From Swiss-Prot:
Localization per record: Golgi apparatus
Protein name: Uncharacterized protein C29B5.04c
GO BP: lipid metabolic process
Region annotation (Disordered) ranges: 111-151
A molecular function (GO) term: phosphatidate phosphatase activity
Keyword DNA damage in record: no
GO cellular component: actin cortical patch; Golgi apparatus
Keywords tagged on the record: Golgi apparatus
Record's keyword annotation contains Transmembrane: no
């Protein structure tokens, strides 16, 4: 979704250099006090600074790759093609609005790309004379008629016609790039508003990082008279993606409200009058001991609908109003935790390029102060496809946990991706630091399990034999499960899962039942026939210290995605130490009471 075509055209364009379009930004980070002894002040402060030096796109002079990128994004999110000249959109049902040139199928294309413009295309027929005017993809039927060219009726010869692409590329791309289904936001907020959001947010896909640029980073402290002074300076060079990172230790300084300020100045500039710099005030200094909340963003605090696929993610990210992406009660829940002196940190697979949009979302959602955020850079479509989401997020989460000293951690995510799997690994690595794991159940909502009523199965004429295997809870009674008799020769084996809560258990305990049904044939020698008999294999796993605060499927479930979620939950419970609770929620109001008790207990100890 974000800029990656440079890898395919390496060397075709000059590397970006510092100019008037160059910008620099600093991302939210926090400092950690270290070396503190009982009854004394800390001796050192761990400084963490992260930023990006990049070049903004020149909207008046976009290259071919940039135009192609925007056009592909338009189709991907369901926007209709935009007219190059007028900025209007053609009607989808009227083919005449897209008609620009009609020629015979024997016409030949002469493409002229000397100026790098895709519209320098001339059409020449085999019967063209010297007096005939040149034809281009921007020649209208009226121009052709005025020059004596016979234009056939498009309704009679649509199969022999060329149409100008609304995306300004070619008729071939018009067939593959015109969205088959328009975005739902066109009908809800209007096409003009969708276009406004798209143009504002899609610019992030065209930003290019500037490598090997030198940045001067200054750390300011504020005294009692509100005067700032520089307490540390660092020179750092940007990496290949344009990012600069500082992880250093400085002597301890007393500052107003225990907050510093950070300024980043780009040392090289083509203009002496313009200094390219970024400034971030109120960078907090956290104690090495305390409680921090590390949360995912997509489908956890922001309704991105990752579970519905990348096309839905692109549509929501680029077109949806920010007030429609909030999740009920989440900001209130986070404010409750910060009122208990917990700090908020975000680790997500969202790209750094989307930070301006995310910052606006957090402000609109009244999210409490963000102490630090860890995102990632999208540097190639191929890498994003091959590299699993868990691998992309694991390193950032590990960096965030290690940078927080000895602080206790509460992990918050969702089951739309692989958050629980990654959090289980972190809990196994830091069993004494993880207080709890909170997972938002978007899978049940997506699958519609709660809306479906389980039909009662009919009893079979034959006796159902139950055979247990791999039962992890011997005390759990085995249960019979039957299905309607169907075509025995064609019906395959079936698998069903069921979550059952054990009554009166502290902490809360669930039993995950697995039923595997299949049919065998038993010979009836008396009647000289073969009768089908259903076999049911049953296994049960005990899930201790699991708290499901939202609605869930209490019946036997055959949905594959829902079954995968149950398996992930059982596997995670086997990896995560039993003293760490796993809490399943959907709305932010549900885990508030549980979280208050958890944090108060942690602070008391």
């Amino acid at each position: 979704m974000f800029r990656s075509f440079g890898r395919l055209f390496r060397g075709s364009e000059e590397s970006p250099t510092i100019n008037d379009l160059t910008s620099i930004t600093i991302y939210p980070q926090c400092f950690i006090s270290t070396g503190k002894e009982y009854g004394s002040e800390p001796k050192h402060i761990s400084v963490h600074v992260r930023g990006w030096v990049y070049e903004n796109p020149d909207l008046n002079n976009l290259g071919r790759k940039d135009r192609l990128m925007l056009n592909l994004l338009r189709r991907y999110v369901g926007l209709p093609p935009k007219s190059k000249e007028t900025g209007t959109y053609p009607e989808k049902d009227d083919e005449n609005t897209n008609l620009q040139v009609v020629v015979d199928t024997k016409a030949q294309l002469n493409v002229n790309v000397n100026d790098g413009k895709p519209n320098d295309i001339e059409l020449s027929s085999t019967s063209k004379t010297e007096n005939d005017p040149p034809l281009s993809l921007h020649t209208t039927p009226d121009d052709l008629q005025g020059n004596g060219v016979n234009v056939p009726n498009p309704s009679l010869s649509a199969s022999r016609s060329w149409y100008q692409s609304g995306y300004g590329i070619s008729g071939f791309f018009n067939r593959i790039m015109t969205p088959s289904v328009n975005s739902q936001y066109i009908s809800t907020i209007g096409l003009a508003k969708c276009e406004e959001y798209f143009e504002e947010r899609s610019l992030a896909s065209l930003q290019r990082g500037l490598k090997d640029e030198f940045v001067l980073v200054k750390i300011y402290a504020t005294d009692k008279n509100f005067e700032q002074k520089v307490v540390a300076e660092f020179n750092v060079a940007t990496n290949v993606e344009g990012y600069f990172i500082i992880d250093e230790v400085i002597p301890f300084y007393t500052t107003k409200n225990n907050k510093f300020s950070v300024e980043a100045v780009l040392l090289q500039s083509t203009s002496e009058d313009k200094v390219i710099k970024a400034y971030m005030s109120e960078v907090p200094v956290l104690d090495r001991n305390g409680i921090s909340i590390i949360s995912d963003i997509d489908d956890t605090v922001k309704n991105t609908r990752v579970i519905e696929g990348p096309r839905k993610v692109g549509e929501t990210t680029l077109l949806a109003p920010l007030n429609t992406q909030t999740i009920e009660g989440v900001s209130d829940w986070f404010r409750v935790m910060t009122n208990l002196n917990a700090t908020v940190h975000f680790v997500s697979n969202s790209p750094w390029q989307l930070w301006p949009t995310l910052s606006k979302f957090f402000t609109n959602d009244n999210m409490p102060y963000i102490s630090s955020i860890y995102l990632r850079h999208f540097n190639g479509v191929l890498q994003n496809i091959i590299e699993p989401a868990a691998a992309r997020k694991r390193s950032s989460l590990l960096t965030a946990i290690r940078s927080l000293g000895d602080r206790k951690i509460v992990l918050i995510g969702d089951n739309g991706e692989q958050d629980l799997q990654i959090y289980a690994e972190m809990a196994a690595c830091f069993p004494e630091r993880i207080l709890g794991i909170f997972i938002r159940d978007v899978m049940s909502d997506f699958c519609g399990v709660l809306k479906k009523q389980t039909t009662k199965s009919n009893s079979l004429p034959e006796v159902v034999q139950t055979k247990p295997f791999a039962t992890s809870t011997p005390d759990t009674p085995l249960k019979e499960f039957t299905t309607t008799l169907k075509d025995v020769d064609n019906e395959q084996a079936s698998e069903f899962y069921q979550l059952e809560k054990e009554p009166d258990t502290v902490p809360s305990t669930f039993i995950l039942h697995r039923y595997y049904t299949y049919r065998i044939f038993v010979e009836d020698r008396a009647n000289k026939t073969r009768k089908p008999v259903v076999q049911v294999e049953h296994a049960a796993s005990k899930l201790e210290n699991v708290h499901i605060l939202c609605d869930y499927c209490k019946h036997k479930c055959s949905n594959i995605m829902e079954q995968d979620w149950f398996v992930q939950l059982a596997r995670a419970r086997g990896v995560i130490p039993l003293h760490i609770p796993i809490v399943i929620w959907f709305n932010g109001e549900e885990p508030i009471s549980f979280t208050e008790d958890l944090l108060k207990s942690a602070f008391a100890s």
